[in-house]
């Protein structure tokens, strides 16, 4: 497969720069892989796609305000630090700007000096491992000093940082939001639960690799970034019961999909409690193990996320759906509209 097989022309004005005032009033394009029919709806209509006994799986990760601005202790020069991965023992993998100034032993001071970072390792790809020094609770300090790391295609300042969090976000650790979940409101989730749908949570901490473009022509040569995931025993038991009863497992977003399919691949289609790192790459030809249907946003041309949707619903149908969305002026990417992909069987 060639990367250009997943390309399409997207007018820049369709890239949503701000979230809608009401989360669930975004538009929803229904894709039916069995009939290859499309329906234009609104996100609150997703309840019509769910039946009593189904499970709706949400990713409860919370985005860290992971962009820090500080000064070099030695010279006072400005340094920007982006936190990528918690390595434990107050050490983080980071990206630094300007990186060339950040040699081993370099110290950076943030805010009023409550937080300091010392470079302990320079990585091959240009990242830096830093060790933080602070008094108090690290996450509280980060909340007061850090900024939300918005995707590179969003150029407007976010007025309310909580709009880049889902309403069910609770497990700190992501560098980006699981954007398929941004459309849900507490009221909509309550209606879904009242219908008899089980709402099940898992955790996958989204890394910045989610925005990294595919740099090879041959898709099979692409190496996915790895991300941490966790599914609890209680959640696994709920999902096994749903499967056993013949109902649907509906995933909210590609992060939930990647977690469930990682576990399904690891346990021969069974759903077990598990945690670890996944670099699963779901592309056309993939044999699905767990997920029956899903909602997701509209993704970047030539991205692994478009490939994932194509792996489920078929490349030609998905590209037709994208063209329909472009023609109908749907909003794209993180703050944009959504699609719901019905079961293919």
UniProtKB/Swiss-Prot annotation:
Annotated GO CC locations: cytoplasm
Protein EC: 2.4.99.17
Subcellular location: Cytoplasm
Pathway info: tRNA modification; tRNA-queuosine biosynthesis
Key words, A-Z: Cytoplasm, Queuosine biosynthesis, S-adenosyl-L-methionine, Transferase
SUPFAM superfamilies on file: QueA-like (SSF111337)
Record-linked InterPro entries: QueA, QueA_dom1, QueA_dom2, QueA_sf
Single GO BP term: tRNA wobble guanine modification
GO molecular function terms attached to this record: S-adenosylmethionine:tRNA ribosyltransferase-isomerase activity
Keyword rRNA-binding: no
EC top class, as a word: transferase
Catalysis performed (reactions): 7-aminomethyl-7-carbaguanosine(34) in tRNA + S-adenosyl-L-methionine = epoxyqueuosine(34) in tRNA + adenine + L-methionine + 2 H(+)
Broad class of the protein's primary localization: cytoplasm
Family: Belongs to the QueA family.
Function: Transfers and isomerizes the ribose moiety from AdoMet to the 7-aminomethyl group of 7-deazaguanine (preQ1-tRNA) to give epoxyqueuosine (oQ-tRNA).
Subunit structure: Monomer.
The protein, known as: S-adenosylmethionine:tRNA ribosyltransferase-isomerase
Gene: queA
């Amino acid at each position: 497969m060639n990367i250009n097989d997943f390309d399409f022309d997207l007018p820049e004005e369709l890239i949503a720069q701000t979230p809608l005032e009401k989360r669930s009033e975004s538009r929803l394009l229904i894709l039916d892989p069995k009939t290859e029919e499309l329906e234009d709806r609104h996100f609150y209509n997703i309840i019509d796609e769910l039946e009593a006994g189904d499970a709706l799986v949400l990713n409860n990760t919370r985005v860290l305000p992971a962009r820090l601005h500080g000064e070099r202790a030695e010279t006072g020069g400005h340094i920007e630090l982006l936190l990528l991965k918690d390595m434990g023992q107050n050490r983080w993998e980071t990206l630094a700007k300007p990186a060339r100034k950040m040699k081993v032993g370099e110290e950076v001071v943030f805010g009023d000096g409550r937080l300091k970072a010392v470079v302990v390792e320079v990585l091959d790809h240009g990242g830096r491992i830093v060790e933080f020094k602070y008094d108090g609770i690290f996450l509280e300090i980060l909340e007061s000093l850090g900024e939300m790391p918005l995707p590179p295609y969003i150029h407007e300042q976010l007025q309310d940082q909580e709009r880049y969090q889902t309403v069910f976000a609770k497990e700190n650790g992501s560098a980006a939001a699981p954007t398929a979940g941004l459309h849900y409101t507490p009221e909509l989730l309550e209606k879904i639960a009242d219908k008899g749908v089980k709402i099940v949570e898992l955790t996958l901490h989204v890394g910045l690799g989610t925005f990294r473009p595919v740099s090879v022509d041959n898709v099979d040569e692409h190496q996915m970034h790895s991300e941490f995931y966790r599914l609890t025993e209680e959640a696994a038991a709920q999902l096994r019961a749903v499967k056993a009863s013949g109902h649907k497992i509906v995933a909210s977003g590609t992060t939930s999909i990647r977690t469930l399919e990682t576990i399904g691949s690891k346990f021969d289609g069974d759903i077990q409690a598990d945690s670890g790192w996944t670099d699963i790459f779901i592309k056309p030809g993939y044999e699905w193990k767990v997920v029956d249907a899903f909602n997701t946003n509209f993704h970047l041309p030539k991205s692994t996320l478009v490939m994932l949707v194509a792996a489920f619903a078929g490349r030609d149908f998905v590209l037709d759906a994208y063209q329909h969305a472009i023609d109908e002026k749907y909003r794209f990417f993180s703050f944009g509209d959504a699609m719901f992909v019905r079961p293919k069987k």
